[in-house]
């Protein structure tokens, strides 16, 4: 959530930054007007309360001296009624302010490219060279069926579209991947966490999914619980409402969890395969950092995700998302896109973001600065390290062989009992 004081004192800068994120200046102007009216009413309320205190003292003095206080009582009752009217107005204005400010996206960092959509994203670097196949490549969903490791038909029967069963060496490959990913992140100083897979509405607000993106989630009917869309939500909210010791920062968390997405706006997109599912595993990275260190931590986090792809030998590129393509809470985001041969293109497999103090303000996560003893908002970062199902897809396609088999990347073999290849039955 944005700082209302910043909007008040640096309106033009904030308006210009949010314009690049699709927010009209009229929205901010209305917010500023509401804020000004609210502050005026607060002053009036305080002045009336001071009058009421004086009137109350005068009534008490009159009663002690056994004098009549009819007029003073009438005056105080009028003042009290005026205070109640103003307080009711303040409640209404506070709600209007909340309705606007809670759905405003984060302001982009100055280094973020300005643009409208993914066409304006900027490629930063590439790693690896896509393999030159001398046979016709198969899509991962066909490979999965032919190898008897992915079962889409029974997934649809048991649950519905965009669900599947992993089986045999497919299940082992999925498990090998997330164990490998977790082990690599632990080497880099991340604490492994097993999170709840349901969170409450306050947690969803804290990380920015609520109220704006409710339709993208699965809520449990008649409860305060939501299935997590990403482990970012429980990991970030771990410290919600707390004040951390500045000497402990930065703090690194990692977790593997299922992620549940309704994909409300994705009808007709990626209807086959592992790219877009309602339920998938993802290894998440979350950091809590001091503001002056957070962008250095973003580069490290991105490198941590790249490390996984490099050790798996998967070609990828790093993209800096433009202002129009970034997620709601992000101030800056790098996407890692892995090469998918059957589609002859790169597809997102990780997204690493610095939200600055946007989530920390919503979730009230602060730290005590050891330098001056002041309590301040920290910065939160999050990143995929990696989306496991998409990594399975990338391995199946990039490591496929002409005979229909798939070679298992060397780093995963210890996690798969020494298996070196997945062969057709």
Curated annotation (Swiss-Prot):
It comes from the Bacteria. Gene3D superfamilies: Bira Bifunctional Protein, Domain 2, Serine-tRNA synthetase, tRNA binding domain. Its EC number is 6.1.1.11. ATP binds at residues 261-263, 348-351. Keywords: Aminoacyl-tRNA synthetase, ATP-binding, Cytoplasm, Ligase, Nucleotide-binding, Protein biosynthesis. GO terms for biological process: selenocysteine biosynthetic process; seryl-tRNA aminoacylation. It is found in: Cytoplasm. CDD domains: SerRS_core. Pfam families: Seryl_tRNA_N, tRNA-synt_2b. One of its GO terms (cellular component) is cytoplasm. Pathway: Aminoacyl-tRNA biosynthesis; selenocysteinyl-tRNA(Sec) biosynthesis; L-seryl-tRNA(Sec) from L-serine and tRNA(Sec): step 1/1. One of its GO terms (molecular function) is transferase activity. L-serine binds at residues 230-232, 284, 384. The keyword Membrane does not apply. It is an enzyme of class 6 (ligase). It catalyses: tRNA(Ser) + L-serine + ATP = L-seryl-tRNA(Ser) + AMP + diphosphate + H(+); tRNA(Sec) + L-serine + ATP = L-seryl-tRNA(Sec) + AMP + diphosphate + H(+). Its main location: cytoplasm. Belongs to the class-II aminoacyl-tRNA synthetase family. Type-1 seryl-tRNA synthetase subfamily. NCBIfam families: serS. Catalyzes the attachment of serine to tRNA(Ser). Is also able to aminoacylate tRNA(Sec) with serine, to form the misacylated tRNA L-seryl-tRNA(Sec), which will be further converted into selenocysteinyl-tRNA(Sec). Consists of two distinct domains, a catalytic core and a N-terminal extension that is involved in tRNA binding. PANTHER family: SERINE--TRNA LIGASE, SERYL-TRNA SYNTHETASE. Homodimer. The tRNA molecule binds across the dimer. This is Serine--tRNA ligase.
């Amino acid at each position: 959530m944005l700082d209302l004081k910043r909007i008040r004192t640096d309106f033009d800068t904030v308006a210009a930054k949010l314009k690049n994120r699709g927010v009209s200046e009229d929205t901010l102007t209305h917010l500023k007007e509401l804020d000004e009216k609210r502050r005026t009413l607060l002053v009036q309320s305080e002045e009336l309360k001071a009058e009421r205190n004086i009137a109350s003292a005068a009534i008490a003095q009159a009663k002690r001296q056994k004098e009549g206080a009819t007029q003073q009582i009438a005056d105080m009752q009028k003042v009290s009624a005026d205070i109640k009217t103003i307080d009711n107005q303040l409640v209404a204005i506070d709600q209007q302010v909340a309705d606007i400010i809670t759905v405003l996206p984060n302001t982009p960092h100055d280094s973020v490219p300005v643009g409208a959509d993914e066409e304006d994203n900027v490629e930063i670097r590439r790693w690896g060279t896509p393999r030159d196949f001398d046979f016709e490549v198969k899509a991962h969903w066909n490979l999965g069926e032919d190898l008897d490791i992915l079962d889409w038909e029974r997934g649809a029967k048991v649950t519905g579209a965009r669900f599947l069963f992993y089986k045999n060496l497919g299940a082992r490959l999925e498990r090998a991947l997330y164990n490998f990913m977790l082990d690599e992140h632990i080497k880099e100083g991340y604490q492994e966490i097993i999170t709840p897979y349901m969170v409450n509405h306050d947690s969803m607000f804290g990380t920015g999914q609520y109220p704006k993106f409710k339709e993208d989630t699965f809520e449990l009917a008649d409860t305060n619980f939501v299935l997590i869309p990403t482990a970012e939500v429980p990991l970030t909210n771990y410290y919600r409402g707390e004040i951390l010791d500045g000497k402990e920062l930065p703090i690194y968390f990692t977790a593997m969890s299922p992620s549940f997405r309704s994909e409300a706006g994705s009808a007709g997109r990626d209807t086959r395969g592992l790219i877009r599912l309602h339920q998938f595993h993802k290894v998440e990275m979350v950091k809590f950092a001091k503001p002056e260190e957070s962008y250095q931590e973003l580069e490290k986090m991105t490198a941590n995700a790249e490390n996984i792809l490099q050790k798996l030998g998967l070609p990828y590129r790093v993209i800096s998302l433009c202002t129009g393509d970034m997620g709601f809470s992000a101030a800056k985001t790098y996407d890692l896109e892995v090469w998918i041969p059957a589609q002859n293109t790169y597809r997102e497999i990780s997204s690493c973001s610095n939200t600055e103090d946007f989530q920390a303000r919503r979730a009230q996560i602060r730290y005590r600065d050891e330098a001056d003893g002041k309590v301040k908002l920290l910065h939160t970062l999050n990143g995929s390290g990696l989306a496991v199902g998409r990594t399975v897809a990338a391995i199946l396609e990039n490591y496929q062989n002409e005979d229909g088999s798939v070679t298992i990347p060397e780093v995963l073999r210890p996690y798969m009992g020494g298996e070196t290849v997945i062969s057709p039955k």
